[in-house]
Swiss-Prot record:
Isopentenyl diphosphate binds at residues 42, 75, 125, 220-222, 264. It comes from Neorickettsia sennetsu (strain ATCC VR-367 / Miyayama). It catalyses: isopentenyl diphosphate + 2 oxidized [2Fe-2S]-[ferredoxin] + H2O = (2E)-4-hydroxy-3-methylbut-2-enyl diphosphate + 2 reduced [2Fe-2S]-[ferredoxin] + 2 H(+); dimethylallyl diphosphate + 2 oxidized [2Fe-2S]-[ferredoxin] + H2O = (2E)-4-hydroxy-3-methylbut-2-enyl diphosphate + 2 reduced [2Fe-2S]-[ferredoxin] + 2 H(+). Belongs to the IspH family. The active site is at residue 127. This is 4-hydroxy-3-methylbut-2-enyl diphosphate reductase. Pfam families: LYTB. It is an enzyme of class 1 (oxidoreductase). Dimethylallyl diphosphate binds at residues 42, 75, 125, 220-222, 264. NCBIfam families: ispH_lytB. Binds 1 [4Fe-4S] cluster per subunit. InterPro entries: LytB/IspH (IPR003451). (2E)-4-hydroxy-3-methylbut-2-enyl diphosphate binds at residues 42, 75, 125, 164, 220-222, 264.
Length: 303
């Protein structure tokens, strides 16, 4: 058996920055309670590890305690949440991914210039909620083609932005449909470099293997999209949180296995999976499937 591990995979620069932010806060404020608004990243292993060290993840901002440390997750927050928190007696640290913050500025620029804004993405995702919450006027969330069909007639200036972790094919389809209905719309895809690189690497790898295993949590948008990309090409494709979820019958008739991981999945989970497969198949050969090198790094926020 041959095992190919996609490169790039796993943590992106925004996730690394967010996780390191929490790590530094734990060390810098040992006497303070640390809260994170939303999961810092969408991965169960990361969240469980931080919870074991006393970090409290909250969805209700009013649950934050005075004199504590509050960290915004990588997904960003609305302007209303930010203003509310700044009125409280606590230490605020913003771990919003810089590429998400860029989308926030884009939305605010469009609004200032008098555009009505379409936001393409999952209406229940923290990033989309935060992005829409950066506008003071009407913004429409479009999650599927039917949402575009149901949009009212818009005669003024119209612009769109997108969630940063969407599937490339889906994003292209949605943008093209918007342009068909509103030929004068302006905007561009905001799908980030890491999402694009991981999807393109998985697309190339899936063509070469009999089985694709994507490591990531089910609430991770980018992990689910890697799974969808894989399943359109490779007949056997599965999304797993860790190696314990692997089923023996998946390997029937399989000679070549491809592995990748979502941008919020720790590398240790991939290595655990590889070790598990090598124990199960002692003669298996493991190699990297090199698609593209990433060198992006972001500065840490002020902590």
């Amino acid at each position: 058996m041959q095992i190919f591990v996609a490169c790039p995979r796993g943590f992106c620069a925004g996730v690394e920055r967010a996780i390191e932010t929490v790590e530094i806060a734990i060390r810098r404020y040992p006497e303070k309670k640390i809260f994170v608004y939303h999961e810092i990243v969408h991965n169960s292993r990361v969240i469980q590890d931080f919870k074991a060290r006393g970090v409290d993840f909250i969805e209700d901002i009013t649950k934050v305690e005075p004199k504590s440390v509050l960290i915004f997750s990588a997904h960003g927050v609305s302007e209303e949440i930010e203003k509310y928190v700044k009125s409280l007696d606590l230490v605020l640290v913003d771990a919003t991914c810089p590429l998400v913050s860029k989308i926030h500025r884009e939305v605010q620029r469009f609004e200032k210039e008098g555009f009505i804004i379409l936001v393409i993405g999952n209406r229940n995702h923290a990033e989309i909620i935060g992005t829409v919450g950066r506008t003071k006027t009407q913004a429409y969330i479009v999650q599927d083609p039917e949402d575009i069909d149901n949009l009212p007639s818009i005669t003024g200036k119209l612009a769109y932005v997108t969630q940063s972790t969407l599937a490339l094919e889906y994003t292209s389809t949605m943008i093209n449909k918007i342009k068909e209905k509103f030929p004068n719309v302006v905007g561009r895809s905001d799908v980030c470099y890491a999402t694009q690189n991981r999807q393109e690497a998985v697309k190339a790898l899936a063509k070469e293997v009999d089985l694709m295993l994507i490591v990531g949590s089910t609430n991770s948008s980018n992990s689910r999209n890697l799974m969808q990309v894989s399943s359109k090409i490779c007949q056997k494709a599965f999304l797993i949180d860790n190696y314990n979820e692997v089923e023996p019958d998946w390997f029937e008739g399989v000679d070549r296995v491809g592995i990748s991981s979502g941008a919020s999945a720790p590398e240790i989970l991939v290595q655990d999976l590889v070790s598990f497969l090598k124990k199960r198949f002692p003669s298996a050969e493991v190699s990297d499937f090199k698609f593209k090198e990433e060198k992006v790094q972001f500065k840490l926020p002020i902590i």
